[in-house]
Each structure stands twice: as structure tokens, then as C-alpha cells.
Amino acid sequence: MINVLIIDDDAMVAELNRRYVAQIPGFQCCGTASTLEKAKEIIFNSDTPIDLILLDIYMQKENGLDLLPVLHNARCKSDVIVISSAADAVTIKDSLHYGVVDYLIKPFQASRFEEALTGWRQKKMALEKHQYYDQAELDQLIHGSSSNEQDPRRLPKGLTPQTLRTLCQWIDAHQDYEFSTDELANEVNISRVSCRKYLIWLVNCHILFTSIHYGVTGRPVYRYRIQAEHYSLLKQYCQ
């Protein structure tokens, strides 16, 4: 399991991020910290190694950026993803200077959160896989694609135009309906796992918008709806 530490002084936000983490297979939240002092205690003194830190910037009496040089000087192996409302260029530049692996501006979509964590894991695994790289492999690792840039809307391996058409036709016929993965999978008679792959792709293409809801049990449910400004893209896949 990948151990995640959440640093945020807002208890409700920290809990929401903890639930997001719990929804991604292979990740677990092993602690939360509302101060930088508490965070350093967990990072440097805990028996559980911290693989990934989710760091807020604007805290009540502290700036989350102050933790980055501490980690850098200590040669800490924990990677950092910033999750903050800070959108100014200076803060972003400082964060990137200290090597944060991703930066999410609040409020963010659940799909973007998942993309940040799974993308980081993919790169981490790739780095541990080889001792040496050729240029094409390095391009893939750094840029997420080969030097011959591919169409981002090209279906990835394992997804078929026929199934995509079926899903898009159902979504088109229910434009005002916000639906879950389970609901759509049942309607078009495909597996939930397969359906979720198509939905993630549609979200990444900005055709669908995703939000998270909590039922009476507190279990999060992702729901999807059409992004009106990209409705024409959906229609293309209905043909």
C-alpha cells in the first residue's frame, strides 16, 4: 500500500481528502496533520514511511511552502502534491522549484484528484523499473507521451468505439440526468469496471463533469453529467 499524509488545518477538508484517498485502490491515508510541526513529527519520526504528502498552502498561522525546503534539505524521499486555493504565480513557481509532483487548485474535480495520485504512482513505478532509459522512454515518463504527440481523444487500448457509442447515446438521451457508474452500467448492460474506464476517459476529454456525493452511510458516490459547452463532442461519439 502507498502511505499518504494529509496536511491541512481545515478538519472538514482533510476528511474529504482522506475519503478521496480511500476510494483509490492501493492508497491509504496513514495520518493527518493540522500544523507543520505535527507533519514533521509524522514524516521524520513515524515507524510508517510516508510515500506521498498532500500539502495545503494557506494555513491559519503557517505557510505550507515552508515545509518544502525542510524536506529538500533533509533529502526526504516523500513526494509532495500541493492541494491549495493558492493560484498565484509566485506560489506555484516556488512549489515547482522544490519539486512538487503535481498541483491541484481548490476546488477541484474528483477525477483530477484521482488522476494526480494514479499518475504519480505510474511514474514512480516506471522509475523503479529500469536502471537506464532511451529518449522515447524518458519522453513517456516526463511528458506522458512519446515525442510523436497523439490525439488526446483517441480511445486507449481496451476501449471500443461500439461500446463508447452505446454509452454516449444513452447519455445523450438523458441530458438533464446526473448518473452514477452503477446506474449507467446497468442501463447499457456492461460491467461496472468497464463502464468506469469509459467515464474517466469522457471526463478527461471534458465531455462529462464529475462530482462526489455522500449517502447515509457516508460512502462516496461519483456522479456524472454532460458539460453543456462540450455537448457537440458527445454528439460526435453518438454516430
Curated annotation (Swiss-Prot):
One of its GO terms (molecular function) is phosphorelay response regulator activity. This is Transcriptional regulatory protein DcuR. CDD domains: REC_citrate_TCS. Gene3D superfamilies: 3.40.50.2300. Residues 3-121 form the Response regulatory domain. The lineage of its organism: Bacteria, Pseudomonadati, Pseudomonadota, Gammaproteobacteria, Enterobacterales. The keyword Transcription regulation applies. Its main location: cytoplasm. The modification 4-aspartylphosphate is found at residue 56. Keywords: Activator, Cytoplasm, DNA-binding, Phosphoprotein, Transcription, Transcription regulation, Two-component regulatory system. It comes from Escherichia coli O6:H1 (strain CFT073 / ATCC 700928 / UPEC). Residues 181-200 bind DNA. InterPro entries: 2C-system_Tx_regulators (IPR051271), CheY-like_superfamily (IPR011006), Sig_transdc_resp-reg_cit/mal (IPR024187), Sig_transdc_resp-reg_receiver (IPR001789). The keyword Zinc-finger does not apply.
